[in-house]
Amino acid sequence: MARHSFIQMSKLPNVKGRISYITSHARQENLYATYRTADNAFWNNLARESRQEFQRSGAEGKCIEARELIIALPEVYTQYEPQQVLEDFTDEFRRRYGVECVSALHHNKRKTNYHICLLYTS
């Protein structure tokens, strides 16, 4: 039975923690590939500057440091090399929207299709 792809978006108040979680083989049982368009220093600076700007603004609630898309891919993508799928998708997203990204390619629990966790600057 063919399944449809879907996208879920979340706001991230702790981008460094989320990067650690989605890219960790110890925490992700079905992790096949990871990819970054910027190094750790970039993400550390982004988190620090976002928190500083949030404090200066006096806004209520949580500071949003980045955003995440969880994208379920059609089953046909399991036929392709995982690292290449992830890099092609992430590079196109970066080119199209002009944002830095961290991404990880996982299988769903039933191992029927891949999904990409894509963190990006907002």
Annotate the PLM regions.
Residues 1-122:
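N-terminal nicking endonuclease/strand-transfer module with a His-rich metal-binding environment
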